[in-house]
Regions:
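An acidic, low-aromatic, low-complexity terminal/linker signal
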Residues: 1-115
Length: 115
């Protein structure tokens, strides 16, 4: 019997991507973000999530994709990274799916620092 993994899926510029559901803290819509004037382009700002300060990152920018159309409001997937949390801006959230671990592609080496 092959090993199974459960993923929270989301769409970015027409591509479906998944992250292990155990890493997902919650999904937010229309949560206010405070901009940071001198932050890197991908950093959209900070949000206060029940007293926890969370960095908001636009995955389109990180992955070199075109900017999100203005009429498309991003959905925020808050993921746990060690003791911290990061809000990943995505186009839309899909389903939670269970797949054979072998059916999933590994994270590209260019993104390994985000692992």
């Amino acid at each position: 019997m092959s090993e199974r993994t459960t993923l929270c899926t989301f769409r970015l510029d027409g591509h479906w991507i998944g992250i292990e559901v155990s890493s997902v803290q919650e999904v937010l819509r229309h949560h206010p973000v405070t901009s940071l004037r001198w932050a890197q382009e991908a950093v959209q700002g900070l949000l206060n999530l029940r007293g926890q300060i969370v960095t908001a990152v636009d995955l389109r920018c990180v992955l070199g994709m075109p900017p999100r159309p203005e009429q498309l409001t991003p959905t925020q997937v808050v993921v746990r990274v060690g003791a911290a949390a990061v809000s990943l801006w995505v186009d839309e959230v899909g389903d939670v799916v269970e797949l054979d671990a072998g059916a999933c592609e590994r994270v590209p080496g260019t993104l390994s620092r985000m692992n």
